[in-house]
């Protein structure tokens, strides 16, 4: 079922499905944009797709046009019950009631979702860590938060960006104006893709992410002071900085993802 400006209120009112602020729900009501987002996923014949936070099914409608198996997951039982009725005759769409952060996502090769603000970082981290067969992910998030995942230096840079850049690459796709949603959020949204490299050593990348996560928890501390939590020995920290050609006075936001990988490998070899 296509969701658009003309039918949204009729459908939502008939099914008594008002947006829930607790779930950060803003429904996309521009089908042309929905189609662009789904097209950006580059779905291929054998892909297994998972959608998080389908709401009334704005993206699900276009996913259902493919012959691939798509699983849509939402924690809001109202939306789940609605979608189960809409797609009960479509064997390619599986509707699941669950918290995405408690869902087994390991089998899926493509991931898509309009992510609510309150779980954006947590959801993206969860997919990166657990969707081990994924090759591409396409998300829509509030534009003001995109830098957290795209930047590799500066005040918006953080551990999730480290993980993204060590597992693959990120690309900005397009911006969606606030008026394309109901209710309209306070800012525009950005659609972006994460491409996962199958040849990456996931274990090493995740280890580096854990180091970055710990260091960014004290982002105003210098790297040498931060590393005291790991090595407890100033001489060893000095040697690490010498061996890695790392300025000990740098702060976490000044360290590139590749250097976090080298720091992690060094720490693991000096346990």
Language-model features: where?
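An accessory alpha-helical subdomain
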Residues: 190, 194-196, 200-239, 244-259, ...
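Short amphipathic alpha-helical segments
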Residues: 264-271
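Catalytic cores of RNA-modifying enzymes
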Residues: 1-214, 242, 269
């Amino acid at each position: 079922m296509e969701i658009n400006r003309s039918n949204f209120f009729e459908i939502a009112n008939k099914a008594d499905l008002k947006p829930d602020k607790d779930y950060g729900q803003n429904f996309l009501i521009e089908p042309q944009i929905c189609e662009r987002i789904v097209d950006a996923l580059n779905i291929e014949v054998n892909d297994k797709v998972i959608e998080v936070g389908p709401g009334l099914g704005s993206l699900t409608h276009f996913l259902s046009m493919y012959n691939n198996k798509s699983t849509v997951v939402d924690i809001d039982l109202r939306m789940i019950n609605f979608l189960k009725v809409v797609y009960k005759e479509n064997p390619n769409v599986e509707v699941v009631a669950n918290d995405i952060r408690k869902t087994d996502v390991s089998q899926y090769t493509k991931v898509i979702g309009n992510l609510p603000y309150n779980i954006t970082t947590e959801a993206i981290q969860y997919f990166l860590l657990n969707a081990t067969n994924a090759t591409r992910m396409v998300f829509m998030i509030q534009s003001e938060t995109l830098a957290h995942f795209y930047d590799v230096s500066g005040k918006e840079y953080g551990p999730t960006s480290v993980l993204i850049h060590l597992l693959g690459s990120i690309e900005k796709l397009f911006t969606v104006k606030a008026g394309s949603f109901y209710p309209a959020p306070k800012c525009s949204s950005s659609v972006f893709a994460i491409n996962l490299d199958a040849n990456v050593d996931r274990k090493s990348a995740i280890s580096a992410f854990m180091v970055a996560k710990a260091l960014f928890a004290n982002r105003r501390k210098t790297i040498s002071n931060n590393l005291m939590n790991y090595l407890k020995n100033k001489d060893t920290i000095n040697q690490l900085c010498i061996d890695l050609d790392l300025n000990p006075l740098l702060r976490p936001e000044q360290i590139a993802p590749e250097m976090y990988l080298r720091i992690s490998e060094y720490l693991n070899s000096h346990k």
